[in-house]
Amino acid sequence: MSDEQRNGPPPAPPPEPGDASVPEGLVSAVLNLVNTGPVLLGAYTIAELTAVDAIVDFLEARPSDEVLAEAVRSLAARQLLVAGSSEEQVQVRGDLGITVAFQRRARKVLDARTTGTEPGEPWRILLLPQPEGICLMIRIDALGVHQIGLHKLDEALRTLIDWLPGGRVAKPDPAMDADAVLTASERSALVTVTDYTAQGSAEVAGASRDLILARNDGRLHVLSRDPRDRAELVPTGAEDREDVEERLAGLLT
């Protein structure tokens, strides 16, 4: 057994002045719950998440100060945001506090965006893997509502794969016009995994890698960026659905 397994997960970093803090022991307690099944953490707007620093900075445009102020008032009225131990801090409570804690622990994010979705479907899914083999999953709908939950990583990946475009994998064709395939596709998706670092409460994007899926006439085209020219898309050589799933999982390693 490793030291981490004996001693529990590493504590969340201490909050910066003006940050929202989360109760001690919260992370380890929730980890035990996730091992028994998904832990659903509620739905929030981007302004509410930004107000408590619960969103990766480079993924979203920052709402206006007026919108953020209204979000703070809304959270305070619901007792999700209360005074902290000093005048410079506030404490995030309830499920939103859990979201903050696990967002801060992540150091990479999978961002999947899909076209051709149906009413009631999310158009975007974020996965923020954790060291213990679980992840924070955020489903974003057309209204910008963020449905958040904690899941085992393998289960979250299965959910993601079921949501992404499917079909019989097309044979790689070097002469294929990628732009034409994407334009004519019934459903397409861009999956980007970005590593990042934290500087205080701010996240700074690092290296990233992409996988592009496009379903056209029942065939699934699997593309990636050409390493010689990242503006160009080329077939990946994926042979079947299992190969696609392995490539998606490989983006996170």
Language-model regions: role of each:
Residues S2-A76, V82-S86:
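Short, amphipathic alpha-helical interface elements at domain boundaries
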Residues E16-P23, H146-L153, G237, R241:
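Intrinsic-disorder-associated interaction segments
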Residues S64-V92, E155-A180:
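Charged, compositionally biased non-catalytic regions
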Residues A71, F102-T117, A205-V222:
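Amphipathic protein-protein interaction modules
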Residues V82-I134, R139-D154:
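Accessory beta->alpha helical hairpin/"wing" motif in late/C-terminal subdomains of nucleic-acid enzymes
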Residues C135-M137, V191-D195, L220-L223:
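Short polybasic amphipathic segments
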Residues H146-S201, G206:
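Internal, well-folded beta-alpha domain core
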Residues Q199-T253:
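Extended, charged low-complexity segments
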